[in-house]
């Protein structure tokens, strides 16, 4: 059996290109469920720790399906642009042999879900709307694994596989806090697309000469500290410019960083904020040296950021 870091193993093995669904209720988030899996797959052990998994082999899955073994109650996977911490143990359905497992709780790197779609895309719809804190068993028939998936796993072509996923953490796809009223004049305004992506409207007039920030959405999640490793969306524009110089939205997934390692104005603005919040930040032109180095921001101009705080790792 191979034991791989979570990012490597799940990137290679687990297809999670997920479609959107409502996070409000499990009933509005249908997942293809096959209750027969429960009669042939057994996974024991605490959630978040490597489970002992057995399969009553030879098991020949007739169709792809999912069975929830532990039902979580946290954030649901609702977008293919989210980040997540996921562990997985994989078994050969025909022999019951364990093929690969991640390191379980040792990896604190949040993985973009779109990156987890490479080898076995047929897993994608089976994890739709799975909640943080859930352990799910997924059975994939050989016909859905395909030659590439079988080779990646090390099973004979035509044989199926069983995956047991522990979904340790699911990060927000966008800030979901309550809108806040701000009376400050001279600050940019923010508009949002349906998926939450912000657009920045720069007002007429000169930029502020001191760093300023506003909370424009207030979340109710964990409080961010200077030592926090945060998952954030960032949209950055130069004052008066019409195009972004930095955009995790355009990159396709949020980023992860330690707050104290961010440019000073950004770090100061989000420290003390809560997960789910969206923060508007203006950095005067004479304070952008760190932004130029870290984010390739343009020189000699004020900068404007919108930061969505999507979660704290650890």
Feature locations, PLM:
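Cross-family detector of peptidyl-prolyl cis-trans isomerase
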Residues: 2-314
